[in-house]
A protein has these predicted regions:
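Acidic/His-rich, divalent-metal-binding segments that scaffold phosphate/diphosphate chemistry
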Residues: 1-99, 105
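Amphipathic alpha-helix face/heptad-repeat signature
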Residues: 53-56, 109, 138, 173
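An active-site-proximal "capping" alpha-helix that borders the catalytic cofactor pocket
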Residues: 60-67, 106-123
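A generic secondary-structure signal for well-formed alpha-helical elements
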Residues: 91, 96, 117-124, 146
Length: 177
């Protein structure tokens, strides 16, 4: 059973000796436990749907790491943090009990994930430096999960580049994973 600490993204982050990497790695372990519990509700809402718990997020991270190979080293600490957060949160829109009709929840879950992300950031990550900017990026990456390439290329958010905690963060790179 894959665990966050066993993913290439988490290992890459923990290899780095920067303050950002240390802070982000610690936060990710806490967040993965919280999100893992929340994602269990997907099984209740969609009992016939394949498992989309925390292991699914870890499988995605491992798959993307295999695809990008050594290019993982060119990602900034903050890019890794944002991408891992998006992998953890991308299916939370399917766990929002009473949020939407079941038949539309699945198709809209990439956008609906913003509700879970917003609530989690406000309640559990209120001390995170540059919280709002990181939340915006994670929300966009999750939204991009439901877009085709043409729609992404037409979206101005796709082209956003930010510098957060001294790190470049490129939506275009993170959203196409």
């Amino acid at each position: 059973m894959p665990a966050l600490k066993d993913t290439a993204f988490f290992k890459e982050l923990t290899k780095r000796k920067s303050d950002n990497a240390t802070i982000y790695a610690g936060k990710l372990l806490e967040i993965s436990d919280d999100v893992g519990s929340f994602l269990e509700y997907t099984k209740t809402t969609f009992p016939d749907y394949p498992d989309h718990g925390i292991q699914h997020s870890c499988r995605i991270l491992n798959y993307v790491a295999r695809v990008i190979g050594t290019q993982i080293c060119s990602l900034s600490d903050t890019e890794i943090f944002c991408f891992v957060l998006a992998a953890l949160f991308h299916d939370t829109g399917m766990s929002l009990v009473g949020f939407a009709a079941k038949n539309t929840m699945r198709s809209k879950h990439p956008v609906n994930a913003a509700v879970a992300i917003d609530e989690y950031f406000n309640k559990a990550l209120f001390t995170l430096k540059n919280k709002e900017r990181i939340k915006t990026i994670v929300t966009y990456i999750c939204k991009a999960h439901g877009l085709d390439l043409d729609a992404m290329y037409k979206d101005p958010e796709f082209y956003v580049v930010d510098t957060i905690n001294g790190d470049n963060v490129r939506n275009s790179i993170l959203s196409v994973f």
